[in-house]
């Protein structure tokens, strides 16, 4: 009951934040558009007005500047980081749900089909947000135990709101 309510409430919040901003998913991007926007941010300090969802570009540009690496390298590393976050989130969430020794491995195997989706090897904003969902669900699962998890859940909701076009 409570888990379903949390999922429905989170989805309601995500949808309502975008409706409150006055737009839904407007444009379709490919990976090279995201890389180009990140290059625009690095070279000129801003992104063009046509980039309605700049989260991926901003993250790539700022991370590349922080670690002094190229945008191309960041565009190669970000999908790997998101896949790692996905697998780690699935493992943590599975262990939080059940202590049965076969539950975590079976949940990991059950989560593998999403890795064959067409958008997975890209750096699109949808990929980043979808890959963070298991970690978000784990944080929601743990919200009743500590206020730290509630703060993390709030941060993740803001992250999803800014990063995923609905």
Stretches found by the model and what they are:
Residues 1-28:
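Transmembrane signal-anchor helices characteristic of membrane glycosylation enzymes that use polyprenol
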Residues 22-32, 75-80, 103:
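Hydrophobic alpha-helical transmembrane segments
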Residues 6-15, 56, 60-65, 78-166:
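Membrane-embedded helix bundles of polyisoprenyl
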Residues 19, 34, 41:
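Acidic/histidine-rich, surface-exposed loop or edge segments in extracytoplasmic proteins
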């Amino acid at each position: 009951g409570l888990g379903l309510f949390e999922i429905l409430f989170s989805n309601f919040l995500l949808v309502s934040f975008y409706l409150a901003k006055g737009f839904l998913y407007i444009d379709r991007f490919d990976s090279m558009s995201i890389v180009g926007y990140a290059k625009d941010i690095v070279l000129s300090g801003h992104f063009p007005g046509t980039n309605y969802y700049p989260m991926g570009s901003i993250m790539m540009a700022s991370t590349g500047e922080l670690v002094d690496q190229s945008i191309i390298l960041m565009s190669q590393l970000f999908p790997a980081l998101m896949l790692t976050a996905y697998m780690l989130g699935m493992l943590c969430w599975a262990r939080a749900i059940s202590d049965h020794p076969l539950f975590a491995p079976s949940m990991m195997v059950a989560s593998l089909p999403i890795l064959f989706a067409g958008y997975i090897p890209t750096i699109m904003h949808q990929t980043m947000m979808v890959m963070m969902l298991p970690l978000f669900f784990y944080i929601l699962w743990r919200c009743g135990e500590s206020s730290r998890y509630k703060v993390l859940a709030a941060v993740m909701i803001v992250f999803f709101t800014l990063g995923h076009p609905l």
